[in-house]
């Protein structure tokens, strides 16, 4: 009897979130984003925590912070992917770099250059590189003084795009 009641409560909660998510400022929209997030597997603990913090920022209307944290999760994912072959392809594509660790990569090269390197090693194509550079631009607008004040919808869209990009990059072998 209790199991049945709990099942009905969970079904009610899911249905309520689906119906409320159509309203522009409804917190239920974050729950829908959680569904996208659950599709991702293979994230590091750090990436997972960064994305969770990003969602918490949305819940607390800290939209610029949410942009920054979700980008940070994506670039960490990219750095880890570049490191997956011990930087062999990266050092071949960028012979002057001589990267030996993720820390070395972070300390010596910009995120813009890292995204360009993803194209050079065959992880992404030119149009995908432009998309990632666009995400970086949004992150920079959020992190530095600017007239960029994202709202709830823009932030959820950005995080959704980041999650979709991670999911896409997870499927890529390069």
Regions found by a protein language model. Name each.
Residues 6, 10-13, 17, 37:
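Residue-level detector of alpha-helical secondary structure
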């Amino acid at each position: 009897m209790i199991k049945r009641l709990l099942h009905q409560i969970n079904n009610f909660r899911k249905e309520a979130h689906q119906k409320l998510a159509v309203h522009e400022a409804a917190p239920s929209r974050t729950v829908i984003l959680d569904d996208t997030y659950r599709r991702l597997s293979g994230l590091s603990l750090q990436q997972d925590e960064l994305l969770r913090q990003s969602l918490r920022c949305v819940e607390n209307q800290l939209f610029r912070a949410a942009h920054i944290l979700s980008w940070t999760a994506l670039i960490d994912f990219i750095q880890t992917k570049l490191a997956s072959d011990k930087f062999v392809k990266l050092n071949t594509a960028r012979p002057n770099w001589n990267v030996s660790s993720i820390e070395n990569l972070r300390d010596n090269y910009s995120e813009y250059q890292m995204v360009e390197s993803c194209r050079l090693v065959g992880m992404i194509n030119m149009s995908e590189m432009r998309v990632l550079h666009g995400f970086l631009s949004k992150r920079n607008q959020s992190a530095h003084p600017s007239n960029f004040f994202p709202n709830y919808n823009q932030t959820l869209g950005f995080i959704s795009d980041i999650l979709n990009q991670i999911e896409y990059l997870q499927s890529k072998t390069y």
